Structure formats: structure tokens, C-alpha cells
């Protein structure tokens, strides 16, 4: 209940300040509040949050695309990590209010992004940046899988394949054996979140993967993640630590969210 109150209070400030209207219409980050709007609607039943999400989703229709067919950000930079800014909300909107008409576009953008960027990131010499991009990409995929209608199995399975490949790419770099020393705190946390959620959703075998990130969970639970070289944790670290914590306390048994009901946000 306290978490719900904090969420709605923050979103009310966003809506009252019209901050969304001030964000560059060509920036993908403008969509990042969309899923939170649906979560608030689910908690409260207040239509203003749902209406805000629907209004925000209108921006998908004419959003500029790059030469490979997926959304082009204002900075013109391509990155697997940018999927996290919009794909989950795009799928959530389509499941809840879009009639699933653009499901093929959601997976189509993942397909194009994956084909163009995944191998380059996986084999990048800049290991630290690559691990962060792969971790964020994995989180985007598992979050998108959670909010879709799983009856559309072909799309669900394709995203699962991409998700598993991303997790595997991180682990093949040796981070598990080395204790994730090559990952900064943000990457470490988002990877732990993605793996824990994948285990809960049975996208990964719990027995094989959960133990790999339990050390990160221990750091969150003990507060160690907040006491590194920095004297204070920034908001991003705190938010990501909260995501990891939420997965450590949730039921490990994956609940079928109801075939036909769509994603977890509104089951």
C-alpha cells in the first residue's frame, strides 16, 4: 500500500506539472512513464492514469523510424538498451487498450534491433558497456513478455529466445565466475532483476540461474549495494535495488496470468 501511494503521488505530480508535454516528442524516454500509469490504474482504478497512458501511447503512431524500421531516438543513436524506454509500454498498451493490433510491430522492432545490434554488443571489446547494454535489454524483454497476451505464443517464444540469449551472453563473458566485478552497480542490479524475474516466469530454469544472482540479492538486503565508493546512492541505484528486492520477496511459483487476460499488470 505504501508503494502504491508513493507511485500515485509521483505520477500525480507528473500529470499536474504537464511535464510529459514538455518532453521532446522525438525522444523515446517520454514513453517510460506509461507502464507506471497502467500500474497506478491497476492499484487505484482511477481512470485518469489509464487515460494518461492512452494519450501517451498516441505518440507511437507517427514516431519516426530509422532505416531498419524500429523507432529512431532524437539523438539518432542506436542501442539495445533503448528498447527498455518504450517496448514494454508499447506492448502493455496494445494488450490493454490497443486491441493487440500492433503486436507484430512490437516484435518486429525487437527483431530488427536484435538483428542489427545484438552480435556487435555481444562481441564488443568494451566489456563494461556491453554487459550493461545486454542486462538492460534482457530486462526489457522479460518485462515485455510479462505484459503481453501469452496466447500469442509465437511472439512470446521469440522474445524468450532473445531474452535467454542476452542472459547467456552476459554469463559467457565470465561475470558469474568473477563475481560480476566487470559490472557497475546499475548493470549488476538490472541483470539480477532480469534473471530473478525470468526464473519466476519460468523463462529460465530456477535451479540453474537463480543462484548466480543471489549474491546481488544479499548485497541489496544488507544495504551493501548502497555503500560503495559513493557516499550516497543515486536515485537510479535505489530504484533498481527496489526492483531486485521486489523479485526476492515475490512468489517464486510463476502464476499463469490468465491466458486471454493479458499481462500481469491487469490480471
Each language-model region and where it sits:
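CBM-like carbohydrate-recognition segments
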Residues: 1-34, 40-55, 63-68, 77-78, ...
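Short, charged, amphipathic alpha-helices and their helix-cap/turn boundaries
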Residues: 53-72, 105-108, 112-115
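Membrane-interface helix-loop-helix junctions at boundaries between adjacent transmembrane segments
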Residues: 71-76, 97
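Extended ligand-binding clefts on enzyme/binding-domain cores
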Residues: 80-84, 88-192, 204-226, 232
Amino acid at each position: 500500500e505504501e508503494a502504491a501511494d508513493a507511485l500515485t503521488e509521483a505520477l500525480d505530480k507528473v500529470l499536474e506539472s504537464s511535464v510529459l508535454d514538455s518532453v521532446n516528442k522525438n525522444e523515446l524516454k517520454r514513453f517510460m512513464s506509461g507502464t507506471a500509469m497502467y500500474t497506478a490504474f491497476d492499484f487505484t482504478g482511477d481512470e485518469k492514469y489509464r487515460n494518461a497512458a492512452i494519450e501517451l501511447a498516441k505518440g507511437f503512431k507517427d514516431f519516426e523510424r530509422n532505416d531498419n524500421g524500429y523507432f529512431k531516438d532524437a539523438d539518432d543513436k542506436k542501442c539495445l538498451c533503448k528498447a527498455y524506454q518504450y517496448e514494454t509500454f508499447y506492448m502493455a498498451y496494445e494488450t490493454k487498450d490497443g486491441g493487440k493490433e500492433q503486436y507484430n510491430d512490437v516484435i518486429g522492432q525487437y527483431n530488427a534491433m536484435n538483428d542489427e545490434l545484438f552480435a556487435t554488443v555481444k562481441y564488443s571489446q568494451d566489456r563494461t558497456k556491453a554487459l550493461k547494454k545486454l542486462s538492460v535489454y534482457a530486462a526489457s524483454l522479460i518485462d515485455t513478455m510479462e505484459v503481453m497476451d501469452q496466447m500469442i505464443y509465437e511472439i512470446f517464444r521469440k522474445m524468450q529466445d532473445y531474452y535467454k540469449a542476452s542472459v547467456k551472453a552476459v554469463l559467457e563473458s565470465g561475470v558469474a565466475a568473477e563475481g560480476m566485478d566487470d559490472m557497475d552497480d546499475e548493470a549488476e542490479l538490472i541483470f539480477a532483476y532480469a534473471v530473478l524475474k525470468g526464473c519466476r516466469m519460468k523463462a529460465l530454469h530456477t535451479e540453474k540461474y537463480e543462484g548466480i544472482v543471489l549474491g546481488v540479492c544479499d548485497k541489496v538486503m544488507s544495504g551493501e549495494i548502497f555503500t560503495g565508493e559513493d557516499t550516497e546512492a543515486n536515485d537510479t541505484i535505489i530504484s533498481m535495488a527496489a526492483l531486485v528486492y521486489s523479485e526476492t520477496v515475490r512468489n517464486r511459483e510463476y502464476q499463469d496470468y490468465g491466458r486471454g487476460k493479458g499481462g500481469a499488470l491487469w490480471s
